[in-house]
Amino acid sequence: MAAIKPITTYKGKIVPLFNDNIDTDQIIPKVHLKRISKSGFGPFAFDEWRYLPDGSDNPDFNPNKPQYKGASILITGDNFGCGSSREHAAWALKDYGFHIIIAGSFSDIFYMNCTKNAMLPIVLEKSAREHLAQYVEIEVDLPNQTVSSPDKRFHFEIDETWKNKLVNGLDDIAITLQYESLIEKYEKSL
């Protein structure tokens, strides 16, 4: 009973953005938080870096460079997603097209928001991230917890609960529904 698209193996194009301490306000500025649905935030992801004052694309911002167009794996620095606990940041990155974010570390709340929105946050050492950033595409194998370039494989850790949710495409509601018969049995006993 998958409620979100499961993630098992994923091959995608990368874009490096090696800034440390990218906070949720840099990911999605608060001025754009007026929507109540999860969609429509992609055009505002990294708004202040992505666009020049006249509204045109900033050619120096990596995700705007031609070689990174269509990237679905973001490789970034340490402490990604720090700052306020806005889930809109995860929504913006997902709507932009990212499925996987590889960083040195994540804010705990942002990490959880990624997994709740079917994005895989992966923690890797700087040397591994620098190696992976040399390639156009890399492959992630969630069941085996590896990230691979054509010539090297890196292991990553993930809590079994988050892994189970992502591999099986389960959101919180789908997990609750797994216990529906027990819930009904309990309700009848009242």
UniProtKB/Swiss-Prot annotation:
CDD domains: IPMI_Swivel
Top EC class of this enzyme: lyase
GO cellular component, one term: 3-isopropylmalate dehydratase complex
One Pfam family matching this protein: Aconitase_C
Reactions catalysed according to its record: (2R,3S)-3-isopropylmalate = (2S)-2-isopropylmalate
GO terms (BP aspect): L-leucine biosynthetic process
Pathway: Amino-acid biosynthesis; L-leucine biosynthesis; L-leucine from 3-methyl-2-oxobutanoate: step 2/4
TM regions (residue ranges): none
Quaternary structure and partners: Heterodimer of LeuC and LeuD.
Summary of the function given for this chain in its UniProt record: Catalyzes the isomerization between 2-isopropylmalate and 3-isopropylmalate, via the formation of 2-isopropylmaleate.
Protein name: 3-isopropylmalate dehydratase small subunit
Protein's organism: Staphylococcus aureus (strain NCTC 8325 / PS 47)
Organism classification: Bacteria, Bacillati, Bacillota, Bacilli, Bacillales
